[in-house]
């Protein structure tokens, strides 16, 4: 789930993870809620990449570079990944104690990934064999690794790096010009939706700023924040991002609430990029929100109740968020106390 989530699409992660792991869980009589919980947490952490939704929204809303937000977040994501792996190990031990020693019939290992009584709604992924490039596996892996290293090192602006890597990958894998057109046309919808989001965000934030609403709302917010709590606004933003992104959409939080908090925080010496990093801490909890469509796909494919998934996963998602908050403060991604003057 951690590797698949690098594409920034939770739906893809859930389809692949559930299709491959649910039959094994059912065969071993394991709790499917642990699978949905771990898949969701992995998606929540890895979705902090610059091409993921939350980081792009925060960067657009506060007019900062996505690379300035993401690169310092890499160590925090590493700590969160370790926490998720430790949690997976602990949940596995708990399942072992619950189930004890299982006796499987002879030859069961040959069919471990097949469940005759499993759900019928698992996705059937049809792949056009003509589009596959197994001989170029290591070439594509090397190109992806080079792109990731360049992103972390900040060699060039993020859009330039992605355009260069995309052009190289397209030429290597599909040298025929007609096939290149078909590949671009097939995936153009995903690109256009993101571009539309950025334009809409720019219009929305422009209206808020140009009419003076952001300034007025920030002054109102400053008025209700006790002077003693103002310097802690970055940490407060990180904490309130858990319930805020649960009860409202990412668009509402990042384009409506975050600019106001950021404007108020500047009075305490906290920069917009630091506020953007703080606002991303609550993303693992956000994926439990009933406003997230991909979560319905996850519980539907796994055959579990949405409420059961929320009750089971909330404490673990909160724990991962708190680990990320502690790591972010330890690595200095945003200050615990603002720098006044």
Predicted regions and their residues:
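Transmembrane alpha-helix interface/packing and boundary motifs in multi-pass membrane proteins
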Residues: 1-9, 40-46, 150-154, 202-206, ...
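Hydrophobic alpha-helical transmembrane segments of multi-pass integral membrane proteins
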Residues: 1-22, 224-268, 272, 279-280
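Core transmembrane alpha-helical segments of multi-pass membrane transporters/permeases
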Residues: 2, 159-160, 167, 171-174, ...
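Membrane-core helix-loop-helix motifs of multi-pass transport proteins
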Residues: 23-111, 271, 281, 294-332, ...
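Membrane-interfacial loop-to-helix junctions in multi-pass transporters
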Residues: 25-35, 135-138, 188-195, 220-238, ...
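Small-residue-rich segments of transmembrane alpha-helices in multi-pass membrane proteins
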Residues: 43-49, 109-111, 190-204, 259, ...
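Long, contiguous bundles of hydrophobic transmembrane helices that form the permeation core
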Residues: 71, 75-183, 301, 336-341
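Helical membrane-embedded segments and adjacent short helical loop/helix-boundary regions
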Residues: 131-139, 156-160, 185-201, 229, ...
């Amino acid at each position: 789930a951690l590797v698949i989530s690098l594409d920034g699409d939770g739906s893809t992660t859930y389809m692949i993870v559930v299709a491959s792991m649910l039959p094994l869980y059912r065969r071993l009589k394991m709790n499917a809620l642990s699978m949905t919980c771990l898949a969701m947490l992995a998606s929540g952490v890895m979705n902090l990449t610059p091409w993921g939704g939350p980081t792009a929204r925060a960067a657009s809303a506060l007019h900062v570079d996505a690379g300035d937000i993401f690169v310092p977040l890499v160590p925090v994501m590493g700590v969160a990944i370790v926490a998720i792996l430790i949690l997976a190990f602990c949940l596995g031990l708990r399942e072992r104690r619950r189930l004890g020693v299982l006796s499987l019939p002879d030859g069961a290992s040959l069919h471990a990934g097949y469940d005759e009584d499993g759900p019928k709604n698992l996705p059937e992924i049809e792949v056009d064999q003509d589009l596959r490039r197994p001989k170029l596996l290591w070439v594509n892996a090397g190109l992806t690794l080079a792109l990731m290293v360049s992103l972390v090192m900040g060699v060039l602006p993020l859009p330039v790096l992605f355009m260069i890597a995309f052009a190289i990958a397209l030429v290597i894998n599909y040298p025929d010009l007609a096939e290149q057109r078909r590949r671009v046309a097939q995936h153009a919808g995903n690109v256009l939706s993101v571009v539309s989001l950025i334009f809409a965000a720019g219009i929305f934030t422009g209206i808020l700023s140009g009419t003076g609403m952001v300034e007025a709302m920030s002054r109102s917010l400053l008025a209700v924040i006790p002077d003693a709590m103002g310097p802690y606004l970055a940490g407060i933003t990180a904490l309130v991002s858990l319930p805020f992104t649960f009860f409202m959409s990412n668009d509402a939080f990042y384009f409506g609430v975050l600019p106001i908090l950021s404007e108020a925080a500047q009075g305490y010496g906290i920069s917009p990029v630091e506020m953007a990093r703080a606002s991303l801490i609550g993303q693992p909890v956000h994926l439990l929100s009933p406003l997230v469509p991909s979560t319905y796909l996850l519980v539907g494919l796994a055959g579990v109740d949405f409420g059961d998934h929320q009750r089971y996963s909330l404490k673990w998602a909160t724990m991962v968020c708190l680990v990320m908050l502690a790591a972010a403060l330890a690595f200095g991604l945003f200050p615990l106390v603002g720098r006044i003057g």
